[in-house]
């Protein structure tokens, strides 16, 4: 089967990551973690942070596609992932989110974005995520109770997709 490397051109504004989608079956085969508050003195206890953290893009990970050109795989290099993460923020798309790539969502914002530089010392490892160096990680704040209660808490969505 054909394998295609996707490359981004920083000069083309219409190319790049337009939104982060929360999905049931992420093509990158990596689920997110739903973070909740731990007990903190002098604060209300058991309030949920409503933050999802997970991989947005994994370098060199074959992603299956079936389209007009038939079946094939795509992948992103580490360099392309760095460009994609930077362009996403530079273009102010932190609040662009969808459900399963179909329905626009309000109240979801990318509040943290980083590239994994060390598997052992990265924040993702603290949460039990095993991702390779070069992975684009993100934390999304969910300020939408309907999305949180209907999709996140019920495990209808398990990861991110771009």
Task: Please place each PLM-identified region on the residue numbering.
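Signature of dsDNA virion morphogenesis modules
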Residues: 1-162
